[in-house]
A protein has these predicted regions:
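Cytosolic juxtamembrane helix and N-cap/initiation of the first transmembrane helix
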Residues: 1-17
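Generic alpha-helical transmembrane segments of integral inner-membrane proteins
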Residues: 15, 80, 102-106
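Alpha-helical transmembrane segments of multi-pass membrane proteins
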Residues: 15-27
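The feature represents the first ordered module of a protein
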Residues: 25-85
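Lipid-handling modules and contact-site tethers
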Residues: 26-28, 55, 90-93, 101
Length: 129
């Protein structure tokens, strides 16, 4: 499990979100359109749970890809909400808020790339038999 590169990218994603949740003030990352800190907490906790489940699904590559796609969807929704907030309010601190989904998306895209690479390798081995 841990020796696979996609698991390492998912662990980076997990620890990045965990560090943000534990050490940073959630009010800073809250979106002012909704003015609720609970939404950002739900976002981060759900992404943490989905990442943890994805790490545990290391033998089921399609389920791992599906859970990563759900997480990509959540990050894109958060990214769009922050972008709308920036254009509506003209806030200058949007860049730090955008770091959460951008960094997480990078980790997830790399993890998906290596999951697909493993799947292609398994398919090619099955073809050889």
């Amino acid at each position: 499990m841990i020796q696979r590169i996609q698991t390492i990218f998912l662990l980076f994603n997990f620890f990045y979100l965990l560090i943000i949740y534990i050490f940073f003030d959630i009010k800073f990352f809250a979106v002012t359109i909704f003015d609720h800190e609970i939404l950002i907490e739900i976002y981060i906790i759900s992404c943490l749970i989905i990442t943890f489940i994805s790490i545990l699904l290391f033998k089921k590559r399609f389920a791992q890809l599906f859970s990563n796609k759900i997480q990509i969807f959540l990050h894109i929704i958060y990214f769009l909400i922050i972008s709308i907030e920036f254009f509506v309010s003209g806030s200058l601190n949007f860049f730090t808020k955008l770091l959460i989904p951008i960094i997480c998306l990078i980790f997830i895209f790399f993890a998906n790339k290596f999951i697909k690479k493993d799947e292609d390798l398994i398919k090619s081995i099955d073809r050889i038999r």
